[in-house]
Regions:
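Hydrophobic pocket/interface hotspot
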Residues: 44, 56-57, 64, 76, ...
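Bacterial N-terminal signal peptides that target proteins for export
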Residues: 1-9
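Surface-exposed, charged secondary-structure patches
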Residues: 81-127
Length: 157
């Protein structure tokens, strides 16, 4: 139980505090649209799995939002860039670089995907399952709602 709380605080600190100083030094990439909603989702997952910060942030317009657990909402390209900067750190630095998300099932309704995925990584003791809603519009990721909880990841000892 103590180990779970330790990781909860590490992940929360990484996602909410640590990236701010990093993102100040980073130049936001140009916005890059995709031809279809499926291409937006595919680009997001491929960039996420490769921890390609430029490709991740290039998908989000200025007014984009990411809805995290407990009502936390990350709004705007800079804040989203900061979020992904923390996520893309190595595991020893509190990030999750090396995690791989694979789609189990995904349904497109309008421009929104309801996607069930499973995450695996060399540093995880077991696969982690979750679901996200990806809201696409005009070839971009307009918003995302996630069930991802870094504190629920079971890390190898």
């Amino acid at each position: 139980m103590q180990r779970r709380w330790k990781y909860r605080w590490i992940i929360l600190a990484t996602l909410s505090v640590a990236p701010y100083s990093q993102a100040d030094e980073m130049k936001l990439p140009d916005i890059r649209t995709q031809p279809t909603p499926q291409a937006v989702l595919d680009e997001h997952l491929d960039a996420l799995n490769k921890c390609d910060w430029n490709r991740l942030v290039a998908q989000y317009p200025e007014g984009a939002q990411i809805h995290l657990l407990n009502g936390t909402i990350v709004t705007g390209r800079k804040a989203i860039g900061e979020l992904f900067a923390g996520f893309c750190k190595g595991p020893k630095d509190g990030g999750l670089n090396g995690i791989n998300f694979k789609v189990v099932q995904s349904t497109l309704i309008g421009g929104t995907f309801a996607t069930h995925w499973v995450a695996t990584a060399p540093f995880l003791a077991e696969p982690y399952k979750g679901s996200d809603a990806y809201i696409t519009k005009d070839g971009l990721m307009q918003a995302m709602v996630t069930t991802f909880d870094g504190a629920a990841l079971k890390m190898k000892k």
